[in-house]
């Protein structure tokens, strides 16, 4: 069975960087929720049209629409053959439960959840170092707090499920990836 991975961590924890390393060494499909949304919006799909209505009104897209977009992507041949690595989904426990049920219906499951743990001070330093105009200390602190509120229940959820692997993301890239490989090589 192909491995199905979830990457969790606060902004600046290194999820995207580690995902780039993982896809070079392991046959898995990196799926970013942002990419799924952009594809549905660009292709003007039924789900994309529904999502656009919420987004244009300045509202969050409901879980049902996000879940349906993710399910459509997970149903594609490349994912069926190689498994997936989700980045940016699930964002809450209801989405995690949907994903578990969806996978179970398709005789599959989450193989591992990699949680990249990094201190707040290092996250701030990394995010400020990106040089984005909107990355002020106040905006960054708010983003970290909002993301903590979403991430921590998911960390607990996957810990209870027995698939959580906490990785110290505050070290050199090669050291972090060494720990990632140790997890993936034992799946």
UniProtKB/Swiss-Prot annotation:
Main subcellular location: cytoplasm
E.C. no: 2.7.4.3
Keywords: ATP-binding, Cytoplasm, Kinase, Nucleotide biosynthesis, Nucleotide-binding, Transferase
GO cellular component: cytoplasm
Compartment(s): Cytoplasm
Region called NMP, residue ranges: 32-61
Keyword Chloroplast belongs to the record: no
Gene Ontology MF terms in the entry: adenylate kinase activity; ATP binding
Annotated AMP binding sites: 33, 38, 59-61, 88-91, 95, 132, 143
Homology family: Belongs to the adenylate kinase family.
Function: Catalyzes the reversible transfer of the terminal phosphate group between ATP and AMP. Plays an important role in cellular energy homeostasis and in adenine nucleotide metabolism.
Name this protein carries in UniProt: Adenylate kinase
Species name: Leuconostoc citreum (strain KM20)
Taxonomic lineage: Bacteria, Bacillati, Bacillota, Bacilli, Lactobacillales
Record gene name: adk
